[in-house]
Regions:
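Anion-recognition interface
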Residues: 1-273
């Protein structure tokens, strides 16, 4: 949050000083920093360069690793996340009309500052890889050259671990309607708590077993066309192959968004309606 300017300059200096002290004292030869929003920092803030310089002063060489989803899936996840923090009143179709044109989903452009700062040391892992059935974590460890050291420490439970579960269609639509009613302005504390209540309520009743899938075929087609050239450049640079040869799409499934009308209760929950 310091690097992306959500904290003031003094806190930014303090955070970087703490990181520098850790790097100076650690006996480790590998340090991992993980933050999803690293991928969308404004170039003006020079986050890759700041980190590369800081690490270099302590004898570390920056590498960039990223997990890649098709833009349509990433946009659905972004929409569900906004619902999870009760910050979205638009339908998915309306969300796509503005967000679907955002340059933050141009992966080739977003990666370029990190590629330069890391002197080309980039590991790009497809969320689903046509070339491998191995779990994502195993592929990430191998891709970073840490397989021999870490693979013996990773059991089946580690490889299958999931966190930050995405909201499903019931919680997403409930959040959207509550936002439009202004309920988010009446919450004490972070409104993410309200989103978690919606998720927990749905999951406890056997609802939302699947993550949200928006109903906007025309918008998703425009998204695919808009980013096709950038994806081709990205795939050629990272894998030396075409995008479709590496990236496996999500299994085909119909939209489950409920914005078009009231949700029909699931059989298990019908008695509670």
């Amino acid at each position: 949050q310091a690097l992306d300017r959500r904290r003031g300059a003094a806190e930014r200096r303090e955070a970087l000083a703490r990181l520098d002290a850790i790097l100076a004292a650690t006996p480790a030869d590998t340090v991992l920093l993980s933050y999803e929003d690293f991928s969308v920092q404004r170039p003006l803030w020079r986050v890759p360069e700041i980190l590369a310089d800081l690490f270099a002063r302590r004898g570390f060489a920056l590498e960039a690793a990223l997990v890649v989803k098709p833009q349509a899936e990433q946009l659905a996840s972004a929409y569900a996340l906004r619902a999870q923090v009760v910050a979205e009143g638009r339908t998915f179709r309306g969300f796509l009309r503005s967000e679907g044109a955002s340059r933050r989903y141009d992966y080739a452009e977003r990666l370029e500052p990190w590629r330069r700062a890391a002197a080309g040391r980039v590991t790009a892992l497809p969320y689903r890889d046509r070339r491998s059935d191995a779990p994502l974590l195993a592929r990430l460890v191998d891709g970073l050259g840490l397989g021999e050291r870490l693979a013996p420490l990773l059991g089946p439970a580690d490889l299958a671990y999931r966190t930050n579960r995405s909201s499903g269609p019931v919680a997403v639509e409930a959040s959207r309607r509550l936002y439009r009613l202004g309920v988010h302005r009446q919450v004490t504390g972070h409104r993410r708590l309200l989103g978690h209540i919606l998720d927990d309520w749905a999951w406890a009743r056997g609802l939302d077993a699947e993550r949200f899938r928006g109903d906007a075929p025309e918008g998703l087609a425009r998204v695919a066309a808009r980013y096709a050239a950038g994806n081709a450049r990205f795939a050629a640079a990272c894998w030396g192959q075409s995008w479709d040869a590496v990236i496996a799409p999500a299994p085909a499934a119909p939209p489950n968004a409920l914005a078009a009308g009231p949700a029909a209760p699931a059989p298990a929950a019908a008695g509670e309606a």
